[in-house]
Amino acid sequence: MSIESIARTVARQLPSTAPLLKAGYRQRERILTGAGEIWPGVIRAQTEKITIAITAHCNLRCMGCKYGRDFMPGSVLPMQVYRDLIEDAAAAKVPAVRLYGGEPLLHPDVVEMVELTNSLGVGCYMTTNALILDQKIDALHAAGLRKITMGYYGQGTAFDEYVQRPGRFDRMVESLNNVRRSYDASKLDLQFNFLLSRRSANIEAVDEVKRFAERYDASIHVDVVHYSLPYFQEGPERELQFRPEDSDNVRRTIDYLLEIKAKQPHLLTESAVALASFEDWALKQEQMRVPCDARKLLWVGADGSVMLCYVTFMLGNLHEKRLRDMLYSPAHHKAARDAFQLNCPNCHCEAASRVEKHGPSLRKYTAMAKDRAG
């Protein structure tokens, strides 16, 4: 059993030890990152999470998303392929998978997938738009699902305009009300993923998502709008993507998020250090030069393709070979090193953990967070 596995077991059994164990993990990662900048050969793949798009089908048409249209149209991951994937992940002691899409609840075998994953000892959570969550939650909860994350794109007509389908906000609210009536926060962890874009970089939008999360006893995760994901688009006239003239709005929004973090530390999933860095991630984009820790990740597409991360470093296809034949191969370790050295489009996936694992970035944004809080 690895040190990481032992630490996770201890944290589950003794939750009070989790902060200390996490701090130790981050410190070890910073040491490795520093060493990797001098000796890249020390960087090797060590998968901690696999993100799996189990279907490209979706019941929305979000402005920023290409799934089911230009990206893998019609693709669905077969149950047998998923079974082989999870068996290999469990054998390799991969701790967790995230199921998403598309809309994962549209997959006919989604409940069986959750049940199988949990039965093999692999942690499992799901990202969904929640439109039909109330119709599936009883079976999913019985199968072992305990955490759900959802995209948040505004409320009322603003939400409907973004997802390009009328009446969907009201349906989502109805679904969430039904879910929470049966499963409170002690039974089901809910998280809203707030997309920080040109449309939402304002205090009013942050207040809206804050009230919405509090209504459902949920946490908030902040996603800075992407500029390099193959399945993401920037909307008509690039209306989602930040521009230099947005700097004042971004700064005010980040300051307000830091204020909320100080008052309600558990509401926002990111640390104050990570939040302070988001201004640079939003405005500097690919000019940010922070080593990437994608060595911890794998991404699986609905067509069976396997990449190191959401953007690049193709490792193979599950329709042609098993995951066990890709994991920790020379190609996998090389991809991990290339990602670390930013020999790639340099996206901002895992931005929060990257700044916390990189000594110079940690010092910079720790000081910035303190200055802006005071």
Language-model features, listed with the residues they occupy:
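Radical SAM enzyme [4Fe-4S]-AdoMet core and its adjacent flexible, acidic
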Residues: 1-12, 139-293, 297-307, 311-316, ...
